Swiss-Prot record:
Self-association and partners: F-type ATPases have 2 components, F(1) - the catalytic core - and F(0) - the membrane proton channel. F(1) has five subunits: alpha(3), beta(3), gamma(1), delta(1), epsilon(1). F(0) has four main subunits: a(1), b(1), b'(1) and c(10-14). The alpha and beta chains form an alternating ring which encloses part of the gamma chain. F(1) is attached to F(0) by a central stalk formed by the gamma and epsilon chains, while a peripheral stalk is formed by the delta, b and b' chains.
Natural source organism: Prochlorococcus marinus (strain MIT 9303)
Transmembrane regions listed in the UniProt entry: 18-38
Gene this chain is encoded by: atpF2
Family listed: Belongs to the ATPase B chain family.
Bilayer topology: Single-pass membrane protein
Segment forming the signal sequence: none
Record's protein name: ATP synthase subunit b'
Molecular function terms from GO: proton-transporting ATP synthase activity, rotational mechanism; proton-transporting ATPase activity, rotational mechanism
């Protein structure tokens, strides 16, 4: 019974002209689908794959450039900070040097003024002593003259 269903008229393996016609339709449909659907879709998929690959490569390149620029900028910032610190240190040294020079000049001026005042005081003292000696001699002579005149 099963053999009749499989090989009989209208069965599963009926070898009349329908089978080759169906095979021809399948081949024809495959060529049509390949020409109208699979090739364009394959092309679009390949184009997108190329686009994605290119975009990823460009993104990696840009990322590498950005990292390189970041490193360069960090180095520039580091060197700028070092230069600024050096400038600050030099300015502090210059300021300290100017302070010391100004202090030395002020001390020298103060010492010179003190020495000048001491010399003036000494000169005035010597002058006063000389005048007092002269006055004392005159007064002594006057006293001696009066004592001699009173005798």
């Amino acid at each position: 019974m099963t053999s009749l269903l499989l090989f009989g008229a209208g069965g599963l393996f009926d070898f009349d002209a329908t089978l080759p016609l169906m095979a021809l339709q399948v081949v024809l449909l495959t060529f049509i689908l390949n020409a109208l659907f699979f090739r364009p879709v394959g092309r679009v998929v390949e184009e997108r794959e190329v686009y994605v690959t290119t975009s990823r490569a460009e993104a990696k390149q840009k990322l590498a450039e950005a990292e390189k620029l970041e490193l360069e900028l960090k180095e520039q910032l580091k060197s700028a900070r070092i230069a600024a610190q050096q400038l600050i240190q030099e300015a502090e040294k210059d300021s300290e040097q100017l302070y010391r020079e100004a202090l030395a000049i002020a001390n020298a001026d103060a010492n010179a003024a003190r020495e000048k005042a001491r010399r003036e005081i000494d000169a005035q003292r010597d002058s006063a002593l000389t005048q007092l000696k002269g006055d004392a001699e005159k007064l002594g002579d006057l006293i001696v003259n009066r004592l001699l005149a009173a005798k």
